[in-house]
Amino acid sequence: MTTPSAELPALARIRDDVRAMQAYVVADATGYLKMDAMENPFGLPPALQAALGQRLGQLALNRYPGTRQNDLKAALAAYAGEPAGSAVLLGNGSDELISLVALACARAQATVLAPVPGFVMYAMSAQLQGLGFVGVPLTADFELDEAAMLDAIAQHRPAITFLAYPNNPTATLWDEAVVQRIIDAAGAQGGIVVMDEAYQPFASRSWIERMRAQPERNGHVLLMRTLSKFGLAGVRLGYMIGPAALVAEVDKVRPPYNVSVLNTEAALFALEHADVFAAQADELRAARTELLAALRAMPGIERVWDSQANMVLVRVPDAARAYEGMKARKVLVKNVSTMHPLLAGCLRLTVGSSADNAQMLTALQASL
């Protein structure tokens, strides 16, 4: 006779904080327009789909991943413009890289610091690896509160400071001078700074330019990107660039063979056709401009924030009502209104194709 899982004595062996958590669940989006996950709406052209399929079909799937990953690291270094003295670390998505950095720094009393609201994986990875987490609220305009950040760094001496550039869910690209002063402060007390550039394809600048121009001020910075927003969310490939000595230490806690031969080859293929994805990003940036204008002209929208990503944050009178109304009209967006007090009344909208954006706008207007 099978014992009901709720009564299993073995459950007592699971950490209390883990048992209190909720597993991440991807809702069934069949029949819906997905505008909730910042995915690239464009697929590969048919000819490239066929070429990729043929290439993947020739892989030795009976063998563990090998030196082809070195080819991918070299290709990513060239694509990103890797600073001198740097190295590349691959991850099964950037989520894994966040966890690896936290694991490598997980000592008693160690702390992770990040602005909030921000990407939820920073706090979750800190919790799961046994580090403390300090969230420093942004300003009401979702800018960095420089004084509060510097005070928190001085007080908590964080092992890791995460800065999403641009930020999620606010799509904010923070002031360079402020960011550099925060990086300086973190470095002065021996901390690591992770610049999370998941949305770099849609931003007007990258921190890697600073890393090349001022290596001495950014020698403790790890820059993290993903191919998800490049257009390969289904492939799950993240990469981290930073000082070779620092990357080598994080690499020690990486599981062997963490990136499959399929992921590796698909990423190499994408980089060989980077012009296709660059054109898609250009189209999405143009669609973002149109979307921002339409949202600002829409009656009932209380505020629309500028965006440097493939998402737009808006404030509406009743976020829950608007979300449910859009869902009833077969459009999924992200209701972030309960994630943090600063996000009260806010929805996060993905920037899609012009046709997708038009459908989303119609659903939003009808749901306000």
From Swiss-Prot:
A Pfam family hit: Aminotran_1_2
Classification via InterPro entries: Aminotransferase_I/II_large, HisP_aminotrans, PyrdxlP-dep_Trfase, PyrdxlP-dep_Trfase_major, PyrdxlP-dep_Trfase_small
UniProt keyword Amino-acid biosynthesis present: yes
GO BP annotations, alphabetical order: L-histidine biosynthetic process
The protein's required cofactors: pyridoxal 5'-phosphate
UniProt catalytic activity: L-histidinol phosphate + 2-oxoglutarate = 3-(imidazol-4-yl)-2-oxopropyl phosphate + L-glutamate
Residue(s) carrying N6-(pyridoxal phosphate)lysine: 229
EC number(s) from the headed UniProt entry: 2.6.1.9
Major enzyme class: transferase
Molecular function GO terms recorded: histidinol-phosphate transaminase activity; pyridoxal phosphate binding
Pathway(s) per entry: Amino-acid biosynthesis; L-histidine biosynthesis; L-histidine from 5-phospho-alpha-D-ribose 1-diphosphate: step 7/9
NCBIfam families: hisC (TIGR01141)
PANTHER family named among the record's database cross-references: HISTIDINOL-PHOSPHATE AMINOTRANSFERASE, HISTIDINOL-PHOSPHATE AMINOTRANSFERASE-RELATED
Subunit structure of this chain's protein: Homodimer.
Family indicated by similarity: Belongs to the class-II pyridoxal-phosphate-dependent aminotransferase family. Histidinol-phosphate aminotransferase subfamily.
Protein name listed in UniProt: Histidinol-phosphate aminotransferase
Source organism of this protein record: Acidovorax ebreus (strain TPSY) (Diaphorobacter sp. (strain TPSY))
